Amino acid sequence: MCWLLVGAVDEGAGIMTLWQAVTWDTARAGGFTAYVLLALSVIVGLALTTQLQSPSKWPRIINNEMHNFLTLLATIFVGVHILATWVDPFTKFGWNEIFIPFVSHYHPLWMASGIIALYLSIAIGISTLLRSKIGYKMWRHLHILTLVVYALVTLHGLFTGSDTQTWWGLAIYLVSVALVGGLLIRRIRLANAQKSRPQPVAVVPQPQRQYQHR
């Protein structure tokens, strides 16, 4: 009888260990995949605003459809990341720690950066759905917050993600920041060049005088 009890306990412990491994790896993979997709979405968005395009012999992959598709995929993997983090028995995060900033028992500041980024992303998504009602100009101003979301998520991943300790994880962050930073600088330079460019002066045609022959 004792052997049966010991065997049942060992089997239960093995199942819990397996479950913990699955949820932990899913949370890690979901979060990192969401970050990569978000970075690609931001890169495509900045490329569109700076009039960059793939070589003429390649398919036209830099377009609004690709930007929206990457954003949708990133949103899905954010949901996977949040759900797996909540059910993971190792991290032991409650719903309040997942959705309320600065109350987490683990790196509260950097966890808060991810939570704030989540709420900003929701606001940007709602503004996109209401673009016809709020106007294009207002939507453009709100859409710029995507860069803030990207910065907050980068900090969240760097300081809370375990994959930051790997060379490939750190390399992905560095390449991502370099690409986004370079495109952002190009975007600012183009905007400044357009502002400094002299605007054409409208020429008002003068009425022609009619001469009378005497």
Question: Could you tell me what each predicted segment is?
Answer:
Residues 2-214:
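Membrane-embedded alpha-helical bundles that constitute the cytochrome b-like, heme-associated redox core
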